[in-house]
Amino acid sequence: MLTKMTAFLARAPALRGLSLTVGDVGPAPYTAGLWCRGITVLDRRENLLGRVTQRCRAEFTLRLCLPCTDADNAARLLDLQIWAAAESAAGRGPVLGNAGREVLRAEQGRMERADAGGTAVYTVRLQAEYTRVYTEETT
């Protein structure tokens, strides 16, 4: 799941020039780190034949370490959120489920902290809602 989300974000124009990895972001400017905050099952249904359908939400946090240029960084965060919404609407988001349409949201972009070394750390919250269908295997 992290691999798919990282590959998806690597296509984002707002993240060009950044080194994107799984895990926390280091102190070096132009780096980004992604990790999964967890998965929540929103709905679970089971039919008489044992087929289980789950609607899930995976939550991720993306941290970016950038030089302190407030206007440029604010625009970068907005551009990323707009791009993610457009990709999701067009059906070009990461495929996390195996049935139905998936919805991806990037939201709550904000500055987390500014460091004395002239860099700032920003966070963006990513949520992906998807459906997984499980069928009981018979022998």
Each model region followed by its residue ranges:
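Charged, amphipathic alpha-helical segments and their flanking helix caps
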Residues: 1-25, 40-139
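A short, hydrophobic beta-strand-centered structural micro-motif
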Residues: 30-39
